[in-house]
């Protein structure tokens, strides 16, 4: 499975130079995206847990390109609504919804059809059963991601690797949290400033 995923990403990266780029993110423009992602818990007591989620993103490009050298880029503020968030645990599967109102993305200004970015964010997660088991149905999420936008003529495809921590922040005892590594795929567009 791992090898197939690596081959898929390699082929995707090879196809990028042939893509006709759309206009990328610009100051005052917007990002609209639908995405899905999933992964597993990292080492520790919750390492057997798996997650899968689907979300919608609205982003606002806040700045024109600035910054030194290879970090020259734009800042984006983003909000994700997550209508599907599954946590597969040892004894059950938790079904949840979330909202991530704190997303900050730095998209590098490459002037090419591939736009690397990194991102941090946070939000809430509400589930029908306790996550992790025996803790709380209300949790908070914090995350960091590294990704690539592949700009096409009208739309873009995004791929990223995301670290996410899920925790009740002390609302219940115990508070073991779940640390996950996820792979995310998005389909969206950047609207231009009018």
Which residues make up each language-model segment?
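Cleavable N-terminal export/targeting peptides
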Residues: 1-26, 192-194
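Short loop/turn motifs that connect adjacent beta-strands in outer-membrane beta-barrel proteins
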Residues: 20-29, 63-75, 109-115, 151-157, ...
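Short glycine/proline- and aromatic-enriched beta-strand/turn motifs that initiate or cap beta-hairpins
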Residues: 20-63, 175, 180-194
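Residues that define the transmembrane beta-barrel architecture of outer-membrane proteins
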Residues: 28-30, 48-54, 93-100, 114, ...
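Transmembrane beta-strand segments that form the barrel wall of outer-membrane beta-barrel proteins
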Residues: 32-42, 78-85, 120-126, 160-165
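Residues on the lipid-exposed face of transmembrane beta-strands in outer-membrane beta-barrel proteins
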Residues: 34, 38, 54-60, 102-108, ...
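Extracellular loop and loop/strand-boundary signature of outer-membrane beta-barrel proteins
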Residues: 42-44, 89-91, 128-134, 169-175
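Gram-negative (and chloroplast) outer-membrane scaffold detector with strong preference
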Residues: 54-128
